[in-house]
């Protein structure tokens, strides 16, 4: 965990980074997400203060279902949100079919790094006692912090990319290149 703590310290992050785990089965040490999240990327911010897992049915954005490995582009093409976004020209079905995708998983967990450190004082949820298999780390940065991340990646020879919409694709792209992807947002 020292590496994640060091990243947060050096960047002077306002919020804890969030560990993202791709799992085949539900963890007994984490609670299932309860509530409504409009899009898959919403879980990243919710994970700042908590530890929980999500299933396919918790992800309410069809494009997020594709990038998070729950559905194929063909499976979501008739969904209302996809039809709306393609009809206004925000994205095409061809673009959706070419988006990076996380490996197919049954469960995606989001865990505040503070919970992994055993700090449990922020937000709700239990402190995570066992170390999960972390696939990705996400954190929210301002422009100065992004500059430091890019500089560090360049100096270390780590591939990095910048992506606009859809932001949910940054996880799959980072996983694929085993590097850093900076998301600029969807709108």
Features from the language model and the residues they span:
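Acidic, serine/proline-rich low-complexity intrinsically disordered regions
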Residues: 2-187
């Amino acid at each position: 965990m020292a590496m994640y703590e060091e990243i947060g310290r050096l960047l002077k992050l306002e919020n804890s980074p969030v560990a993202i785990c791709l799992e085949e089965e539900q963890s007994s040490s984490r609670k299932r997400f309860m509530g409504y999240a409009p899009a898959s990327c919403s879980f990243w911010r919710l994970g700042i203060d908590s530890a929980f897992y999500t299933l396919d049915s918790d992800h309410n954005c069809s494009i997020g279902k594709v990038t998070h490995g729950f559905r194929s582009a063909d499976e979501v093409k008739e969904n209302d949100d996809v039809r709306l976004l393609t009809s206004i020209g925000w994205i095409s079905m061809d673009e959706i079919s070419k988006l990076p995708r996380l490996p197919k998983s049954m469960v995606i967990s989001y865990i505040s790094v503070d919970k992994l450190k055993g700090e449990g004082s922020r937000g709700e949820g239990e402190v995570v006692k066992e170390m999960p298999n972390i696939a990705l780390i996400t954190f929210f940065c301002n422009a100065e912090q992004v500059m430091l991340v890019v500089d560090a990646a360049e100096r270390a020879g780590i591939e990095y990319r910048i992506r606009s919409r859809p932001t949910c694709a940054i996880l799959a792209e980072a996983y694929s290149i085993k590097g850093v992807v900076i998301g600029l947002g969807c709108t």
